[in-house]
């Protein structure tokens, strides 16, 4: 089993790197504002038709454009969900959503979280899925990538006040990156058996003679961007465990590759844009080493399973509960780590049924800020915050002014870094405490003891860090949970983007200092170790007391 797990992980990483590097070079052209071959004339026509003036923006103007863009998208999606009962493409005649569920869902999809307090096949019309949720999957992903484009330019430029044009970046990312990749992946899914139609649900009779409905819909098109954009929201309630979303072992592999493809490519693009490919590789190495460690722990925990099962007469202690037999333990464990490392939230197994340690690792990956590959864009700008923090700590230890890529890290940057890093832990801990202190919060708990607490902690962690996966034993479809998690998703997304853009605005105005003999090398093994240590110490220790009350207590209770 260990050899199989190693081969699965090694082959996955090999294919990922082969695919991501050339994509990273294309992304570097976008960051450098170089039109892709053959598209310059098309872009000029697009800018004229859309009324886009391609002048560059300062950080505040860029930020306001991003915030306005997402606010308008959220309002449009909220209205669509409320009115879906009277709109077309609704063959099942599904009613509009309640205001609190519509608000939760709208914020969920504009924040790239895709938390779902509903079952898609029994709640959403085809119009809501296509025009509402799928469109926001593209736009929320483009938002995250645009922000990291701006931050990357801040490191590459000097003595400037502009970071690019938000409307140009959003358009290019959507049309030339997300749309072509999604089309290719969707066509592959259709070939593998994923539905793509607008038919009404199909009645059929099971072998036992029971009459049921077979759900239909435009699944493949939403499935592709759900993964490539690290969105994660499933067309069906079972998400990628559903055979209509993820029918074969081959689609499962492609789904895992799609989740990490753009976050990995952005690391290569970063190194290319700052004219030092070693910097991008160093960040990628740090992410990969943490990822490998987490995969090993989850695979070990799930294959070890629960030893008490043997005393009850089970044939094996392997933890197959909540997993699809067509994927097995190893592929399910790998998928769980990928989807929580990348703030995707799609699942091909039920995380609530993992062992205590096997479920703790995905939760912990979210709690460290979704910086191990992370969401498209958000993962890299989150890790760059930790990079600058690590440089600052190293500077304090040796008594030198901290620098990264020739840019001095001053008091202003450190204040913004601290603010951005502290946003999500504050939301998670206060949100969990509020849920546990109130009757409305505890009413959603279906399980007592440490596991029930873990379900609450996981839900708030997932929302605040814009992941969207869940421990399913929590009744979150109530006004209390809809509003609490909506607040966490909204603040967890945009209260991080705001200081990141402020940092970019400060750095782009600074001069790039030439390296001196005393300059800290930020591309070697020593710095990679320092960066990993910073992520583990700052990002992880915050949650040790909470984890001790939940998954750790549950684990030791089984010994």
Swiss-Prot record:
GO terms for cellular component: plasma membrane. It is found in: Cell inner membrane. Keywords: Cell inner membrane, Cell membrane, Ion transport, Membrane, Potassium, Potassium transport, Transmembrane, Transmembrane helix, Transport. Pfam families: KdpA. InterPro entries: KdpA (IPR004623). GO terms for molecular function: P-type potassium transmembrane transporter activity; potassium ion binding. It comes from the Bacteria. It is a multi-pass membrane protein. The chain crosses the membrane at residues 5-25, 63-83, 131-151, 173-193, 254-274, 282-302, 327-347, 356-376, 379-399, 416-436, 483-503, 525-545. The system is composed of three essential subunits: KdpA, KdpB and KdpC. Part of the high-affinity ATP-driven potassium transport (or Kdp) system, which catalyzes the hydrolysis of ATP coupled with the electrogenic transport of potassium into the cytoplasm. This subunit binds the periplasmic potassium ions and delivers the ions to the membrane domain of KdpB through an intramembrane tunnel. Belongs to the KdpA family. HAMAP family: KdpA (MF_00275). This is Potassium-transporting ATPase potassium-binding subunit. The gene is kdpA.
């Amino acid at each position: 089993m260990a050899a199989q797990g190693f081969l699965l992980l090694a082959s996955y990483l090999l294919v990922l790197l082969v695919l991501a590097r050339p994509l990273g070079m294309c992304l570097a052209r976008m960051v450098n504002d170089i039109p892709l071959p053959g598209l310059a004339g098309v872009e000029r026509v697009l800018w004229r038709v859309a009324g886009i003036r391609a002048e560059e923006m300062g950080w505040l103007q860029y930020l306001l454009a991003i915030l306005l863009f997402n606010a308008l998208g959220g309002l449009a999606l909220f209205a669509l969900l409320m009115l879906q009962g009277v709109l077309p493409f609704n063959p099942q005649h599904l009613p509009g959503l309640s205001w609190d569920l519509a608000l939760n869902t709208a914020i969920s999809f504009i924040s790239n979280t895709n938390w779902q307090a509903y079952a898609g096949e029994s709640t959403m019309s085809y119009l809501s899925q296509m025009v509402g949720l799928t469109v926001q999957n593209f736009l929320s992903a483009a938002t995250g990538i645009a922000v990291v484009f701006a931050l990357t330019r801040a490191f590459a430029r000097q003595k400037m006040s502009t970071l690019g044009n938000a409307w140009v970046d959003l358009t290019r990312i959507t049309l030339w990156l997300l749309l072509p990749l999604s089309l290719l992946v969707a066509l592959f899914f259709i070939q593998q058996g994923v539905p793509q139609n607008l038919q009404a649900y199909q009645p059929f009779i099971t072998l036992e003679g029971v009459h049921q409905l077979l759900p239909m819909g435009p699944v493949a098109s939403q499935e592709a961007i759900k993964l490539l954009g690290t969105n994660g929201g499933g067309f069906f309630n079972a998400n990628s465990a559903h055979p209509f979303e993820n029918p074969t072992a081959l689609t499962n592999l492609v789904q895992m590759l799609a989740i990490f493809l753009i976050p990995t490519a952005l690391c290569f693009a970063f190194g290319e844009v700052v004219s030092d490919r070693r910097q991008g590789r160093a960040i990628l190495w740090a992410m990969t080493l943490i990822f490998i460690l987490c995969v090993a722990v989850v695979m070990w925990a799930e294959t070890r399973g629960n030893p008490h099962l043997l005393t009850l007469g089970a044939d094996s202690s392997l933890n197959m509960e909540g997993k699809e037999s067509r994927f097995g333990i190893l592929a399910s464990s790998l998928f769980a780590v990928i989807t929580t490392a990348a703030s995707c939230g799609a699942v091909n197994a039920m995380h609530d049924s993992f062992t205590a340690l096997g479920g703790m690792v995905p939760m912990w990956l979210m709690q460290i800020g979704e910086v191990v590959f992370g969401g498209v864009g958000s993962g890299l700008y989150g890790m760059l915050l930790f990079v600058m923090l690590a440089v600052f700590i190293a500077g304090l230890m040796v008594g030198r002014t901290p620098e990264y890529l020739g840019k001095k890290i001053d008091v202003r940057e450190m204040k913004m870094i601290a603010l951005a890093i502290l946003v999500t832990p504050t939301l998670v801990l206060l949100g969990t405490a509020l849920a546990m202190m109130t009757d409305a919060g505890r009413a959603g708990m279906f399980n007592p003891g440490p596991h029930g607490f873990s379900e609450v902690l996981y839900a708030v962690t997932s929302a605040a860090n814009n992941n969207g996966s869940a421990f399913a034993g929590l009744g979150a479809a109530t006004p209390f949970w809809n509003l609490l998690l909506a607040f966490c998703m909204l603040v967890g997304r945009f209260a991080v983007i705001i200081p990141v853009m402020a940092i970019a605005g400060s750095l782009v105005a600074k001069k790039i200092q030439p390296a001196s003999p005393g300059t800290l090398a930020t591309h070697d093994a020593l710095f990679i170790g320092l960066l990993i240590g910073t992520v583990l110490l700052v990002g992880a220790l915050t949650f040790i007391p909470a984890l001790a009350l939940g998954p750790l207590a549950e684990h030791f209770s089984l010994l």
